[in-house]
């Protein structure tokens, strides 16, 4: 096995001071996301979503953030997927935005709520047609024999939907994650990182600096 214990670097790209922390965490998230979007980070909206199964076993996967506002964070998925099955059983999830190349990360805990069909359809119709077709092809998280099976099914569905709009699959939808806590981490020199956690208190937020 490779020796990896010596892999490390200093975090020197910034600090997060008390006076720079706004009362609303979504304002800080928006400001950080703008910085990330202006950088050369690929997939700036990629986030890890963690769910747990009925035995308490956690699972993680990368999805794309598609919208955020004062209500929370939105993503879309196959409703027959493992993550959707987990959420149906336990709607408590966590999200992580791993912006490590800029020494930043944002960790969110919250409750995942299904989006309305109207919201889902609006987003689905904005997707490239090939992505819409792909939504019909994959029975997400189920075993398949080979990639060729997917490619054959895609070709079949592409021919089927060659004319007109691609309909929204009944098994495709999305979630709004309403945050209960949002933690911002800014890497610091000598491992003296800056951490601030926001906690939802009824309709307002409280924030606290945490030791690294």
UniProtKB/Swiss-Prot annotation:
Binding residues for substrate: 8-11, 66, 123, 127, 131, 191-193
InterPro entries, per database record: Pyridox_Oxase, Pyridox_Oxase_CS, Pyridox_Oxase_N, Pyridoxamine_oxidase_dimer_C, Split_barrel_FMN-bd
BP GO terms, sorted: pyridoxine biosynthetic process
Keywords: Flavoprotein, FMN, Oxidoreductase, Pyridoxine biosynthesis
Cofactor(s) needed for function: FMN
Pathway: Cofactor metabolism; pyridoxal 5'-phosphate salvage; pyridoxal 5'-phosphate from pyridoxamine 5'-phosphate: step 1/1; Cofactor metabolism; pyridoxal 5'-phosphate salvage; pyridoxal 5'-phosphate from pyridoxine 5'-phosphate: step 1/1
The keyword Kinase is annotated on this UniProt entry: no
Single GO term (MF): pyridoxamine phosphate oxidase activity
Keyword RNA-binding: no
PROSITE patterns, sorted: PYRIDOX_OXIDASE (PS01064)
Reactions catalysed according to its record: pyridoxamine 5'-phosphate + O2 + H2O = pyridoxal 5'-phosphate + H2O2 + NH4(+); pyridoxine 5'-phosphate + O2 = pyridoxal 5'-phosphate + H2O2
Sequence positions that bind FMN: 61-66, 76-77, 82-83, 105, 140-141, 185, 195
Family: Belongs to the pyridoxamine 5'-phosphate oxidase family.
Assembly: Homodimer.
Its job: Catalyzes the oxidation of either pyridoxine 5'-phosphate (PNP) or pyridoxamine 5'-phosphate (PMP) into pyridoxal 5'-phosphate (PLP).
PANTHER family: PYRIDOXINE-5'-PHOSPHATE OXIDASE, PYRIDOXINE-5-PHOSPHATE OXIDASE
Protein name (database record): Pyridoxine/pyridoxamine 5'-phosphate oxidase
Organism: Shewanella pealeana (strain ATCC 700345 / ANG-SQ1)
Recorded name of the encoding gene: pdxH
